[in-house]
Curated annotation (Swiss-Prot):
Domain of life: Viruses
Protein source organism: Spiroplasma virus SpV1-C74
Record's keyword terms, sorted: Host membrane, Membrane, Transmembrane, Transmembrane helix
Entry keyword annotation includes Transmembrane: yes
Subcellular location(s) of the protein: Host membrane
Annotated family: Belongs to the plectrovirus ORF5 family.
Membrane topology: Multi-pass membrane protein
Protein name per Swiss-Prot or TrEMBL: Uncharacterized protein ORF5
Entry GO terms, CC: host cell membrane; membrane
Main location: host cell
Membrane-traversing stretches: 20-40, 47-67
């Protein structure tokens, strides 16, 4: 039964701690399964408490010994994925924004140059008119 359970479980971490505690937990599950089926003098609630207790122990062991490898791998894959997405989308968006800003600056500069040239022409026209009036 233990081998069958181990065959069904997909193991991400093949460390010795994981194998030892998986084996111990499977043995406890087998013992409680026998107690449950043979109706030995334990109440159902006490069996449920023991099951919950050992499940908490198992999960805490995974949290302690599994974080160093599994979550680091997860974090590296998430960072790689995020950096790839960032480089493929956000940087393009930033460049588009810069181009739009540069284009708007160019347009503003062109408009300002036109205004200045119009002012300069108007000044020249006024000065020639006034010079002509004085003559």
């Amino acid at each position: 039964m233990v081998k069958m359970i181990n065959l069904l479980v997909v193991e991400n971490n093949n460390s010795n701690w994981d194998k030892i505690f998986s084996f111990v937990f499977d043995i406890f599950l087998f013992i409680f399964d026998v107690i449950w089926n043979t109706k030995l003098p334990m109440t159902n609630t006490s069996i449920a408490y023991f099951l919950v207790f050992f499940m908490v122990i198992k999960l805490s062991i995974y949290a302690i010994h599994g974080t160093s490898t599994q979550y680091n791998n997860l974090g590296s894959t998430v960072n790689n994925g995020v950096s790839q997405v960032y480089s493929s989308t956000v940087r393009k968006g930033i460049n588009v924004g810069k181009n739009v800003y540069q284009n708007s600056n160019k347009q503003q500069v062109k408009k300002e140059l036109k205004r200045q040239s119009i002012r300069y022409q108007a000044k020249n026209i006024r000065s020639t008119k006034f010079k002509g009036d004085k003559k």
